[in-house]
UniProtKB/Swiss-Prot annotation:
UniProt function note: Catalyzes the reduction of the glycolytic intermediate dihydroxyacetone phosphate (DHAP) to sn-glycerol 3-phosphate (G3P), the key precursor for phospholipid synthesis.
Gene Ontology terms, MF aspect: glycerol-3-phosphate dehydrogenase [NAD(P)+] activity; NAD binding
Presence of keyword Lipid metabolism: yes
EC number(s) on file: 1.1.1.94
Active site per the UniProt annotation: K162 (proton acceptor)
Top-level EC class: oxidoreductase
GO CC aspect terms: cytosol
Compartments it resides in: Cytoplasm
Similarity annotation: Belongs to the NAD-dependent glycerol-3-phosphate dehydrogenase family.
GO biological process assignments: carbohydrate metabolic process; glycerol-3-phosphate biosynthetic process; glycerol-3-phosphate catabolic process; glycerol-3-phosphate metabolic process; glycerophospholipid metabolic process; phospholipid biosynthetic process
Catalytic reaction annotation: sn-glycerol 3-phosphate + NAD(+) = dihydroxyacetone phosphate + NADH + H(+); sn-glycerol 3-phosphate + NADP(+) = dihydroxyacetone phosphate + NADPH + H(+)
Protein name: Glycerol-3-phosphate dehydrogenase [NAD(P)+]
Length: 305
């Protein structure tokens, strides 16, 4: 299979390596790379979008200008929300390439661990089962297990929404709040993800799988996670600017928190953890006050959402 990977960051190069290891022909495009976008797209049978969310719309415009032949599979591996529409990256691709098969790839996939040869699993989801199956076969190996799903909305939203909860988990660890508090935070974070995800058309059960709970557990517990690193630094009293300056790559949860909080307010959608993390990121509330605000919310019966 001839594959074009858009984005030369850690995740893009990792996916390129996984596909190349299965004897597929892979070309990678990045803004600083040697290959032009047209060269990378030429004769591609699948295009993997591994771009930072902020770059997606602009690159789509470039791909439109160059043209993409019918039948080319578009694979979205970006985990973020668009500032203008408050929609995930796949929605941008779908709007401009409605006649192309769309596949979403998401799961508990820390690029550094995969590059080190450690085992991992992921999900490729699509309304087009044949397209999902082709991408599954393209990437699967003895160290990278790939599942398919028809719930592409739920699979993508799990990866997007968990970034905000990972920041919260990092704050909790930075403050030294202990295992009890972190367990409560992750559990209620999952409930918040399900509430938002089902509002946007995902299936609740999808969030208990690899792309939801699996990705959530990984990013909330690993210092390799950029979103966790942001939260941990804030919990230690560092400024957001200082944390981001040291960060390698993009912590999508920072932008996602602000976009989601604004959307939720307009839509009367309850997102208490996101609201508090947004306040901390914006310097409106110190982490200890955000914790107190969560702990003193109205008492209620536990539910899954």
């Amino acid at each position: 299979m001839r594959i074009a990977v858009l984005g030369g960051g850690a995740w893009g190069t990792t996916l390129a390596d996984l596909a190349a290891a299965q004897d597929h022909q892979v070309r990678v495009w990045s803004r600083s790379g040697a290959l032009a976008l047209g060269e990378v797209l030429a004769q591609a049978e699948a295009v993997f979008s591994c771009l930072p969310m902020a770059a997606v719309a602009g690159v789509i415009d470039q791909v439109i200008a160059l043209g993409l032949p019918a039948g080319v599979i578009v694979v979205n591996a970006t985990k973020g929300l668009d500032r203008r529409t408050a929609r995930p990256a796949s929605s941008l691709w779908q709007a401009r390439f409605a006649d192309h098969p769309l596949v979403v790839l998401s799961g508990p996939n820390l690029a550094a661990e995969i590059r080190a040869g450690l085992p991992a699993a992921t999900v490729v989801a699509s309304a087009d089962g044949q397209a999902a199956g082709r991408i599954q076969q393209c990437l699967a190996s003895e160290r990278f297990r790939v599942y398919t799903s028809a719930d592409w909305r739920g699979v993508e939203l799990g990866g997007v929404l968990k970034n905000v909860i990972a920041i919260a988990a990092g704050v909790s660890d930075g403050l030294g709040l202990g295992a009890n508090a972190k367990a409560a935070l992750i559990t209620r974070g999952l409930a918040e993800m399900i509430r938002v995800g089902t509002h946007w058309g995902g299936l609740a059960e999808t969030f208990y799988g690899l792309s939801g709970l699996g990705d959530l557990l990984t990013t909330c517990n690993s210092p390799l996670s950029r979103n966790y690193q942001v939260g941990f630094g804030l919990g230690k009293g560092q400024s957001l600017e200082a944390v981001l300056e040291r960060l390698e790559g993009t912590a999508e949860g920072v932008a996602t928190a602000a976009i989601l909080a604004e959307y939720a307010q307009r839509s009367a959608l309850e997102v208490p953890i996101t609201d508090q993390i947004c306040a901390v990121l914006g310097g409106l509330r110190p982490p200890t006050e955000a914790l107190a605000a969560l702990m003193t919310r109205r008492l209620r019966e536990e539910d899954g959402g």
